[in-house]
Amino acid sequence: MICLKILRFYQKFLSPLKPAACRYYPSCSEYALWQFQKKNFFLAFFSTFFRILRCNPFFKGGFDYPRVSKNFYPINLCFKPIFLAEKQLCFLYIPYKNKSFYLIKIIFKRTNQ
């Protein structure tokens, strides 16, 4: 998706040129990246837009994890353990309200032993 490439370009080349000034964690660009990875374009755009509007001296700041809605289905008792999984776990879904979750990215890399 073009939005993800633009955000990664901004994070890699433009963001290091200016001082860190975001009042929230995760930063606004990281928040936008997570939103565009997990929501459709319009929902991600509006969530990011309102987050950037809140990132100013009139708001307190702090932790503001993205919230996503997701339907989880009961899993089978026969599942692959994490070390046999084909994909690496990237996000944690922390329950917030009915079918709404905080999205938290796993920042530690798995080491092969």
Curated annotation (Swiss-Prot):
InterPro entries: Membr_insert_effic_factor_YidD (IPR002696)
Superkingdom classification of source: Bacteria
Cellular compartments annotated: Cell inner membrane
TM regions (residue ranges): none
Signal peptide range in chain numbering: none
Keyword terms: Cell inner membrane, Cell membrane, Membrane
GO cellular component: plasma membrane
SMART domains noted in UniProt: Haemolytic (SM01234)
Pfam families according to UniProt: YidD (PF01809)
Mode of membrane association: Peripheral membrane protein
Stored PANTHER family: MEMBRANE PROTEIN INSERTION EFFICIENCY FACTOR-RELATED
Function summary: Could be involved in insertion of integral membrane proteins into the membrane.
Family the UniProt entry places it in: Belongs to the UPF0161 family.
Record's protein name: Putative membrane protein insertion efficiency factor
Organism: Campylobacter jejuni subsp. jejuni serotype O:2 (strain ATCC 700819 / NCTC 11168)
